Amino acid sequence: MKIIRNIARRPWPRIGGWLPVMMLICGVLASCSSEDESTAPLPDGKYPLQLTAEVAQPQTRAGGKDAWTGGEEIRVSLEGVFGNKTYVMDASGNASPKDADNAFYWKNTDEARVSAWTPDIESETDISDQSGGYAAFDVLYASAIGRYDQAINLRFIHRMAKIEVILKAGEGITEEELEGATVTIFGDPLTHSTAGLVSPGDQSDGEIKPYYDAATKKYEALVPPQDMTGKPLIRISIGSNDFTYTLSLIHI
């Protein structure tokens, strides 16, 4: 009886070791098979990158960019492909390559990230005078993941922080006095932008002349995100009086 029990138990360590090995091999084979099925090379120049685009955060930016009017150029990058290319928007929100040299084509069937930005500013920009508008540096950025067999929709967001000031009469100040008021925004008057990412220039605080929207009676200015904690943010000059606003905690 003792011999029979030993014989009965003896195969199980071998079988128990065999099954996990077999399952591991099957798992590896399944993974390889799945990868082969999901990623396959595509013929060169056959599947162009298809793009549509919209501007998110549709708050009014009279001096900036809220919608496509046609002709705007956006810079585009495709994950896995070296370099950036230029696409041109139409008024319907469709993007097409600027020319044949600026066309992206899918290399395989795998998903990839598409990033885009406009305007393409690669140097330090002076933003101290925005009285004529700020569209030239109203940086928009978008990113999305897609495949070769579908159009990719890009939702552009504004990268710069926007400051709005509305003046109202009251407490001894008349509408006539407000018409002659001067509004000054404090902050870094320089900005850097690279591939849709913005940052302050030299970090020095300066004065920015805002854009005035007569229709909404708003003073508007764009600034790169920066820490203004404990620093003056807005100065309003009415006649010989200056009113300065400083917020204790603010990161714009």
Spell out what each predicted region is:
Residues 2-3, 17, 25-249:
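Sec-type signal peptide cleavage vicinity
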Residues 10-22:
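Sec-dependent N-terminal signal peptides
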